[in-house]
Amino acid sequence: MTEQRPLTIALVAGETSGDILGAGLIRALKERVPNARFVGVAGPRMQAEGCEAWYEMEELAVMGIVEVLGRLRRLLHIRADLTKRFGELKPDVFVGIDAPDFNITLEGNLKKQGVKTIHYVSPSVWAWRQKRVFKIGRATDLVLAFLPFEKAFYDKYNVPCRFIGHTMADAMPLDPDKNGARDVLGIPYDAHCLALLPGSRGAEVEMLSADFLKTAQLLRQTYPDLEIVVPLVNAKRREQFERIKAEVAPDLAVHLLDGMGREAMVASDAALLASGTAALECMLAKCPMVVGYRMKPFTFWLAKRLVKTEYVSLPNLLAGRELVKELLQEECEPQKLAAALLPLLANGKTSHAMHDTFRELHQQIRCNADEQAAQAVLELAQ
């Protein structure tokens, strides 16, 4: 009598965020199926949870068109090799974690060979290049989506999708400790506090920092006690921001932070930030915000034609209305940004109403995503 093979799950993560998701999924699966086997492309966190790495995650983690072109032969070789090896292994389920340009084609290749496939983290198909939904539908048996409006989009096209909630919503408390965050950052409890988050990419920091600093200067005229915290993702962005500040606002006192974006949001009465995941994190930190964003004119012209959503920030997309002010392109200028932030710093009716809605939205997407993802994998494996 042959021994039954353990549940075998193949996974591919292409960057750090995917490694974190993959590790959480593996942990949740091991609790239910302790002898399960995990193989694929993994980062250090997934490997620490017991995933066998056929390739290191860094092999896939390339950013930008030039870098991708330089590595294209290697990436295509890895994908062909994984198609062959996973095809021979016949895992019970393949889970492609984010990295859609790499994973969706791989999922399609494996599905043709009879392997059940899951795409974990929906690409922004609801916002632009919507026709990708048909390719995703052909390539996957199931999409795992973080946000409810993503599931609604897939339902419209009859692509199987499961809303599992957002891991960030699971990780952050419903009622953050504002005073605790202020203790960590050295901000007095009774001071007004503004967080400036000009983005994580060099182009964003270059485009937004000057106007964000000028906005803070205007706000300091109304609130002389205003504490300004500026978390920056790495040394390169900090150096870039310091250079711009020396040109634009050399005398403006600010607290520059290495990382610590979440602490800055929790500690602040209001935040001015670039769009993106930071807006979702700020919502979960219950920090009232204004979104300011600018890009090169041609890029903006193109985006207006390609993007199919009414709003750019995730809090507004979740709420289905303009919950937070979005000031884009020419609108993203100091006078308008300051005018939008003033009522939030006053900490009155406007910011309290925003805080309450943020809490409701947090509860909507706080669904224990790791457990939900593990359940979906096991159901498909049966």
Curated annotation (Swiss-Prot):
Keywords: Glycosyltransferase, Lipid A biosynthesis, Lipid biosynthesis, Lipid metabolism, Transferase. One of its GO terms (biological process) is lipid A biosynthetic process. Its EC number is 2.4.1.182. GO terms for molecular function: lipid-A-disaccharide synthase activity; phospholipid binding. It holds the Pfam family LpxB. It catalyses: 2-N,3-O-bis[(3R)-3-hydroxytetradecanoyl]-alpha-D-glucosaminyl 1-phosphate + UDP-2-N,3-O-bis[(3R)-3-hydroxytetradecanoyl]-alpha-D-glucosamine = lipid A disaccharide (E. coli) + UDP + H(+); a lipid X + a UDP-2-N,3-O-bis[(3R)-3-hydroxyacyl]-alpha-D-glucosamine = a lipid A disaccharide + UDP + H(+). Pathway: Glycolipid biosynthesis; lipid IV(A) biosynthesis; lipid IV(A) from (3R)-3-hydroxytetradecanoyl-[acyl-carrier-protein] and UDP-N-acetyl-alpha-D-glucosamine: step 5/6. InterPro entries: Glyco_trans_19. GO terms for cellular component: membrane. Condensation of UDP-2,3-diacylglucosamine and 2,3-diacylglucosamine-1-phosphate to form lipid A disaccharide, a precursor of lipid A, a phosphorylated glycolipid that anchors the lipopolysaccharide to the outer membrane of the cell. Belongs to the LpxB family. This is Lipid-A-disaccharide synthase.
